[in-house]
């Protein structure tokens, strides 16, 4: 298991890389988002990662409306993803995530699924050309369902899954982590950990919501998963990140 941190998009990326490395994390989940982590010197970032011997996973903007029914907006989103792939490729990053798009007025869930799959297909080909693996992150309905992810993986066999355990807890009778690992464990290549109280994506420190982390970790370990886990915890008090890491290590 490797434990990393998602850089806070409100803070300068350079400062985040230094803090993450100096506090002994294994990798940075490098998100490219405004205001603090959008425009930066790629060569400087690459040099820092190398000097700190810090590994990296690629995280993209979760709010891009790439299925919105206007060609100009879709093109802009596609251009953004091309930029992400280029930057991550320069940084030697091999895993890049993508979030489903929900911004489609008057579109049924079925049509949203179809439009997302079509976009994923294009981005996946671009990633493959750059020797990168694309992974889809679970979130809100209809992209909270293991069945929908089974369908996506069936249509795009070499795409992978980025499972956010916090997202799997939102508006569900039971956390869906077990269901995802039961049906798609061989497709899951990256995890996000943060806590919540079951209604919103709160990004709380571990143990501050209602997720049963000991049980979640038991499920994950039983599957044989031993890859990257990102702590996606947003708090001005960064000692909560360190405490969450210590709790994770203890529970693991």
Model-derived regions: residue spans:
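Hydrophobic faces of well-ordered beta-strands that scaffold small-molecule active sites
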Residues: 2-7, 28-30, 56-61, 96-98, ...
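Conserved radical SAM core fold
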Residues: 62-66, 102-105, 195-201
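Active-site acidic/histidine proton-transfer and metal-coordination neighborhood
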Residues: 67-160, 170
């Amino acid at each position: 298991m490797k434990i990393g941190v998602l850089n806070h998009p409100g803070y300068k990326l350079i400062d985040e890389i230094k803090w993450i490395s100096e506090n002994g994390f294994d990798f940075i989940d490098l998100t490219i988002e405004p205001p603090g982590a959008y425009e930066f010197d790629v060569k400087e970032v690459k040099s820092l990662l190398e000097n700190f011997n810090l590994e990296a996973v690629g995280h993209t903007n979760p709010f891009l409306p790439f299925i919105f029914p206007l060609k100009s907006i879709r093109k802009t989103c596609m251009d953004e993803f091309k930029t992400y792939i280029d930057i991550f490729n320069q940084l030697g990053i091999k895993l890049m995530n993508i979030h489903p798009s929900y911004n489609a007025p008057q579109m049924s869930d079925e049509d949203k699924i179809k439009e997302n799959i079509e976009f994923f297909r294009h981005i996946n080909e671009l990633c493959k050309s750059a020797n990168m693996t694309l992974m889809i992150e679970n979130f809100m309905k209809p992209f909270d369902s293991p069945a929908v992810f089974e369908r996506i993986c069936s249509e795009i066999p070499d795409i992978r899954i980025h499972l956010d355990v916090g997202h799997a807890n939102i508006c569900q009778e039971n956390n869906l982590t077990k269901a995802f690992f039961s049906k798609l464990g061989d497709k899951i290549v990256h995890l996000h950990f943060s806590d919540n109280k079951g209604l919103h994506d709160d990004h709380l420190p571990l143990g501050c919501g209602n997720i049963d982390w000991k049980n979640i970790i038991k499920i994950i370990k039983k599957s044989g998963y031993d890859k990257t886990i990102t702590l996606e915890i947003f708090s001005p008090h960064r000692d909560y990140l360190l405490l969450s890491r210590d709790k994770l290590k203890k529970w693991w």
